[in-house]
Amino acid sequence: MMRQSLQAVLPEISGNKTSLLRKSVCSDLLTLFNSPHSTLPSLLVSGMPEWQVHNPSDKHLQSWYCRQLRSALLFHEPRIAALQVNLKEAYCHTLAISLEIMLYHDDEPLTFDLVWDNGGWRSATLENVS
């Protein structure tokens, strides 16, 4: 009897830990992006890259930006096993990115969307992370 009740409780505890891990990673990433003393290269945390104003549709520069951001985030966040960075919007004054994250010890992908807004990064998805 005792063994059956433990089996029923363990998945819920594991799910709570996974949810806490996901929220912690997203919160830490948002803090990293918005920190004035961030260890990320200034190009990646200043919001609108300089090239964006002059070449908003340059796919090579957008790809380079995503690769640089991916490399920096993988270096600074050890809980990320795999990461894909996508530009959702890249216009003259709008920058929105989507991070597709696989965490260690988590079988489900995590999507974390960030938008540059009024001089800082905000998350469109942090409240919905579970």
Swiss-Prot record:
Gene Ontology molecular function: anti-sigma factor antagonist activity
A GO cellular component annotated for this chain's UniProt record is: cytoplasm
Which domain of life does this protein belong to?
Answer: Bacteria
Q: Which UniProt keywords apply?
A: Cytoplasm, Stress response
The UniProt entry, under InterPro entries, shows: Anti-adapt_IraD, IraD/Gp25-like
Q: Which GO terms describe its biological process?
A: cellular response to oxidative stress; DNA damage response
User: Key word Cytoplasm present in the record?
Assistant: yes
Localized where?
Cytoplasm
One Pfam family it belongs to:
GPW_gp25
Q: What's this protein's family per the entry?
A: Belongs to the GpW/Gp25 family. IraD subfamily.
Report quaternary structure and partners: Interacts with RssB.
Q: What does this protein do?
A: Inhibits RpoS proteolysis by regulating RssB activity, thereby increasing the stability of the sigma stress factor RpoS during oxidative stress. Its effect on RpoS stability is due to its interaction with RssB, which probably blocks the interaction of RssB with RpoS, and the consequent delivery of the RssB-RpoS complex to the ClpXP protein degradation pathway.
Q: What is the protein's name according to its record? A: Anti-adapter protein IraD
Species whose genome carries this gene:
Escherichia coli O157:H7
